[in-house]
Amino acid sequence: MTPSILGHLDRLADEHPDKLLYSYLDVNGDPIESYTYASFLQRVEAIAGHLWKEGRFAGGDRLLLAYPPGLEMICAFFGCVRAGLIPVPVYPPSSRGFQSALYKMVHIAKDCQAAGILTSRDYQASLKTNLARSGVSACGIDVDYISGLPWMATEEFVTPIAGRPAAAHSKVLFLQYTSGSTMEPKGVIVTHENILDTCPLVIDHSSPVVISWLPQYHDMGLIGCYLYPALKGGTTYGFSPTDFIQRPILWFDAMTAYRATATAAPNFAYDYCLRAGRLSKESLEACDLSSLRVLMC
């Protein structure tokens, strides 16, 4: 039988259904969206059911995930997996660097032969606005390609769908594309087995508590901060990269408040926090990071 990360999550949900799995925080550190193990899998099942009900996709089809920061992208990721589809996380083009990001998104959609795009209502509306303002049609970007794909806002997929047949799990969990900063983005196959084998090498303790502001379309954020903790029966508290830049003390406050055992960030983030005026002596004195066991960079 093909190993599946969902099999592990199903078992953990049976063992402690009411344990907190994911919580997303606002800029003040207050939770704005949360899921227990049981409620998360219920949502995943609902998304999978609606993807199956649409009848547009076959097992193994690739779906782009284009979401703003939040838990909806994580729900959609697992919903694809439950439905036997292959999620492809992408950076959602926004007003800053719009044309470059849009070019990469179109390239990825073509390269993986995406069958559709999952997103949120708000992001889809903002993308249309940015498209109208940017004049990308004159820049050689094939917008018609992604416009011709089915777009689905997964917030609407909340009710269970009865009668959905069990999907056959592919060995492929998802496709992770490189950033494309120096050349065209290239897709890397990530399997269920890859994640299951490497998880204990990165997080060596049970029930980890992870704090993350990392982008969820990035491998360090998605794998290290949302997949690994879930497979270890842990809890992830996430917040937006923008909120970290605006208020870096939020990272330290969250690690203190929730007794984080693990976190992750690239080198620039630590340099950013050390710059004069970013963090006051008084705010740091109130922090307690003694619970940390793993710090990835």
Predicted regions, residues:
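A short helix-loop-beta submotif of the ANL/AMP-binding
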Residues: 70-95, 107, 111-116, 208-209, ...
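Conserved AMP-binding/adenylate-forming core of the ANL superfamily
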Residues: 22-75, 95-103, 187-196
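Conserved adenylate-forming
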Residues: 101, 110, 122-151, 241-297
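ATP-dependent adenylate-forming carboxylate-activation enzymes
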Residues: 25, 67, 88-107, 121-123, ...
